[in-house]
Amino acid sequence: MLATLGSVAATVQMTTRSAVTPRLLPGELVPAASALNGISFGVQLTLGPALAGVLVASVGFGWTYLVDVVLFTTMFLGIVTLPKMAKAEGVERPGWKSLKQGIDFLRNAPNIRMSFIVDIVAMTFGRPHVLFPALGAGVIGGGAVTVGILTAAMAVGTFLASLFSGPVGHVHRHGLAVGRAITVYGGFVLLLGLTVLGMQVGLANGLVADVGKTFPDVNWIALGVAAFAMLGMGASDEISAIFRSTMLLMAAPDGMRGRLQGIFTVVVAGGPRIGDLYIGVFATLVALWFPPVLGGIVIIGLIAVLVRVQRTFRAYDARTPTP
């Protein structure tokens, strides 16, 4: 129950915070704001669990949750003291009618719609996280430590891409940039799959030393390549996210931004779950290496076709944003 309430609250908070950004900042600073959000997300995924682990080990769960309560209370007090924003034009009372209007608007907004579609493609065919325990147990070795390294590598990539994203503000062809970033993402997914394939073939034919569930028994070369692939996935996904978020925030009118941001949240949350199903099914039916290899190829191929077919998306210019 608490986890469900926390997830619902986080979704509402994220949607609202993203939707108000263009009303607080001039248009040229929106990409920087999206990058700053990526830095925040990267810090949360890297430092947050580490700090929680230290607190749990030193003072226990009770005091750790108390620290969490204090931090959330401080954040809440900061929010309630903010000045009230003027009501945006064209905003209606929330309800099913409002949701339907958002969906109807999306049908006639090819650029925003395509930004959702390409993200679904990337997240469906390029989310190898459910493979990590199996990789740590018998392919790369290293057990739980390997799982942690591969998971953290993507968050580090997200953080670094956001930290050094200054040149992003000088790019105006956002649709083309999104397509290229996701293509690079697919390349890193393919690299991870080929690494797993190489290890499985090597282990089966005695070409590489056996690995184990303890970290000293890890294959260091395979772990390094896999971690590099995950870091690259995090970085390229964050670059894509910066451009996609900026397109949504700048091209959508005030009255529709919140509703579209809600749909965007559903895409971001739902795509990875479909991806987990895809990875799990094909890893079970074929082999561990198959879903990331096929996924990387599918991502690269589909993105090339989609960007070529949707000419308005390819030609999208941030200086004249159109939905």
Predicted regions located by residue number:
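Cytoplasmic helix-loop-helix junction between adjacent transmembrane helices
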Residues: L2-L45, P49
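Structural signature of transmembrane alpha-helices in multi-pass secondary transporters
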Residues: G6, N37-L45, A122, M154, ...
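Small-residue-rich segments within alpha-helical transmembrane domains of MFS-like 12-TM solute carriers
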Residues: S7-T15, M123-R127, G234-I242
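Transmembrane alpha-helix boundary/hinge residues in polytopic small-molecule transporters
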Residues: T15-T16, V20, S115, L131, ...
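Helix-loop junctions on the cytosolic side of multi-pass membrane transporters
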Residues: A19-R23, F61, Y65-G95, G169-H172, ...
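A gly/Pro-rich, aromatic-decorated transmembrane alpha-helix motif that marks the paired
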Residues: V43-L55, R273-F282
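Juxtamembrane cytosolic amphipathic helices that cap and anchor the N-termini
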Residues: K97-A122, I221-V225
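C-terminal transmembrane bundle of multi-pass solute transporters/carriers
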Residues: K100, R107, F132-P133, A137-P323
